Every structure is written in structure tokens, then in C-alpha cells.
Amino acid sequence: MKSHKSVRLISGIVILSVVFTLASTAGPVMAADKEEAQGIVDKAKVTLEEFLRDKNYSWVNEHINKEKGVLIYPQVLKAGFILGGSGGTGVFLARNAKGEWSQPAFYTMGSVSFGLQIGGEAAEVIVLCMNQKAVDALMTSKVKFGGDTSIALGPVGAGAKSNVVADFVSFAKSKGLYAGLNLDGSVVDVREGLNQAYYGKSLTPIQIVVEKKATNPGSSALRAALKKAK
């Protein structure tokens, strides 16, 4: 009997140790993820403002507040499939019928090869969602550009007025210069961990973007920058 009691006691101690260990590490991990998420939001604002100031991307400035939504990636690596962490994570925001921008949801982007025409190591990327089909596609867990949805390079140059017929329209620059970044075949996926860290609970993109189940005041500057576009 004593041996059984000893086994139960030891088992209980082990379980408690595991619980305390998980509890002690969960806080710092969540805090680090939240800090990373806010950093991406802040960098997305900088990327957006750089595009809006650049006369070569006047098309973005003129259309961003007419379309359904936008993906903003502060940094996309030249090649290699990106599964989160540094370099391949951005934010998606949708615009409702009143012209109000949603809270950001976090997404990764990856491809076998992005093929930057100017040979840069990384690029800043903005992708406009031109219709409801594009927004609906992003509400699923994963989207492949050029699969069920079409994507095209956006018009570049001062005074560009070209009409583009596609679900998504992309723009990219590397070190401040135009980058002909072909995103056809790239995969965009929800980064659930950052969404949870940023809002303090597990949420789907629909709950964040459409149903407005949570807010984070840290996104206000980014949303204000979007609203300022023409």
C-alpha cells in the first residue's frame, strides 16, 4: 500500500511540476508574440505610407479606399517558402460599406520563388483586394494566388491609369525601387498564433475582420493611415 501511495504522490508532484512549468513559460511566450504582432502592424503602417507618398504608386493611393481590402507585407523574402516568423508575415484589413477599415488579421505568404526582377533580397508588398471574392477567399484558412483567385501586377508610374481586371492586384518595391514581384502561385495563410496573441483570445479572420469580436488600440495608427489615402 505504501508503495502505491508513493507512486501516486510522485505522479502528482510530476503533474504539478509540468503545470507550473507551462504556466511560467506561457506568459513570456504570449508576450513575445504580442510584441512581434504589434511590430508587424507598426511596420505595415510605415510600408503603407511609403507607397502612398511615392508618385510611382499613385494608383495605390487613388484606389485603396475604393476597394474591398488590402494585404500589407513589410518584408517578403526573395525566395524560399515562408511559414511565419521573420520576413513573411503581414496584415489584412477589409473596408466595409461605410468605408471603415477593420482591425488587422495576420497572414503569412510563401512561394517556391518570388523572382524579384531587380535581384533584391527582400521587398515590401501591398496587395489590393478588388472584389468580394478576394475578401471571401482570405476568410478561409489558405489562399493560393492564381488558383481559385486571379492576381495581376498593378500599374506603376506617375499618373498610371490602367484598368486591371483581377481579384487581387499587387505592388512591390525593394530598397525603395520598383520590384516586379510575381506572386502567382504564392500561398497566403492565416497566422493564428499572432491573431491570438494580439487580441488575447483565439479568433478566426471572420471574427476579427467581419464580426468585429475584438479590437486592439495598437492598430489605430495603421487604420488612420489607410483612411488618409485619397
What is each model feature region?
Residues 1-8:
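N-terminal secretory signal peptides that target proteins for export/translocation
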Residues 12-24:
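Bacterial N-terminal signal peptides
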